Amino acid sequence: MKFKHAKPLALAAAAVAISAAGGAEAAVSPEKQISFLAEQAAVWGTDAFYRDWLQDDGWCAITDLDGNKRLELFFVRAVRNPVPGMNDKGNNEEKGRALVATVPITMRVRGFEVSADGKRLEELKFNYPDKIIPPNLTELREGFYNAGDKTRFYHTYTLNRVRDLGFCLYRQVISLKNGTVEVQTIGTEYGNYGLFMEAATAEAIFDYAEDRHGKKMQEKELSDYVKAYSAGASPADFNMRWIYSEKWKKAQNTPGGVRNAFAENWKEFRWQLKKDTR
């Protein structure tokens, strides 16, 4: 399926020398926290959310998004439903509809954080001040630091199918502070998927965009609007990876596999302010 992702943002912001964001001291080493997280399956792995997450081949990851040295465990799954007339073995248009059906209609997210004493697993809250659009955390791409409120924040893109062949691409900003994940939807791009008898594809055709206040604009205007949102923040060298379904199922069937999967995943997490190159 052809889909034009939004271009990476090029932000010019000065890096500042700071201590770990959040200011909290880590009482427990990351290694011990990882072991603790793996042992807490009774907390994160027994309810309906987890069963649906397994069935939908979701993703999970170990992070420290707020920089308080208390590790987080996030679960993300995509919710999908059929598109009328879809048939992955039919004609090209029917195959195109089957491709569109792979686009989620919404996401489901859940997160936990190790307590300061390392003895409890606390479920994170999600707050939506704009629109209740659960974010696709697997698309977290850029990290920033706001010196004003000493908060790390991240940009993500959440693509949802709307009705049969429509879509919305939500431009979102994510931050975590004091146990709450703040999800701000600062812009939305609207469009539809075009189908063709000549080829088994579905092409994303953008219609218009609007900012968080409902002001309509073109795609480039929205990109500039999103860029301006982070103009006063310091960019970070940010990286994280997700544990996919196949690896997760293998880990579950291996002694110590979940802890090892968590440990390997944590090694991929990186957050460091970029040097000022001016």
Regions found by a protein language model. Give the residues of each.
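Bacterial N-terminal signal peptides that target proteins for export
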Residues: 2-10
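C-terminal segment of classical bacterial N-terminal signal peptides
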Residues: 16-25
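Acidic, small-residue rich beta-repeat scaffolds with periodic aromatic anchors
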Residues: 26, 32, 137-278
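N-terminal "mature head" segments of proteins
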Residues: 27-61, 69
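Beta-propeller blade repeat segments, especially FG-GAP/WD-type strand-to-loop junctions
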Residues: 27-31, 84-126, 172-177
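Repeat-based blade/solenoid architectures
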Residues: 46-58, 128-144
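Repetitive beta-architecture junctions, highlighting loop-to-beta-strand starts
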Residues: 58, 105-109, 167-169, 181
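Acidic/hydrophobic-patterned starts of short beta strands in beta-sheet-rich repeat architectures
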Residues: 65-78, 146-158
